[in-house]
Amino acid sequence: MPYKPKEREYRNLASFDTPTSDNDELIVRGMPIVFNVPTVICEFDGVEYKEVIASGALDDCDMSDFILNRNHGANDATVYARTRNDSLTYQIVPQGLKIEGHLDKEDERHCNLYRDIEKKRVDKMSFSFVVREDSYDSETRTRTILKIKKLYDVSA
């Protein structure tokens, strides 16, 4: 059975939609979590290890305050949007988690992120989380995330 961390995990799964702007703000949209789609997490000696996020994984998940950032804040601690102040909104849909981030047009860092997404220099999203419950199928080498305890961030 592959390594199963007990702490925060990071996944790079989905794409951004084409961003839009209006007179006051820059808006980025995407789906950082996609349900029921196997993703290859790693390959070791030609063997693929996969992961699936189950469709009910976000039920009872703590999503009270998560942020949109860049590269999980590794080189840039900028918070681009946040659920707590409604600059980051989300919707759980049958396909996964949809987000909409409202960026500040007057902040150069926000404009740079928006431009990078618009020009597809940044075209994937990821998320960090803690698992509450999972299962593992040794025949298919697939871990299924059944429940996510807390969502920390979605990231460009």
Q: Where would I find each of the regions flagged by the language model?
A:
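Short, solvent-exposed polar/charged micro-motifs at secondary-structure junctions
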Residues: 41, 77-80, 136-139
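Residue microenvironments linked to proteolytic maturation
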Residues: 12-14, 20, 25-27, 86-156
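Polar/acidic, low-complexity leader/linker segments enriched in S/T/G and N/D
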Residues: 1-65
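Residues at the C-termini of beta-strands that transition into short coil/loop
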Residues: 34, 72, 155
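Short His-Asn-centered micro-motif
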Residues: 30-31, 70, 128-129
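Short histidine-centered beta-strand/loop micro-motifs
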Residues: 42-43, 79-81, 113-116
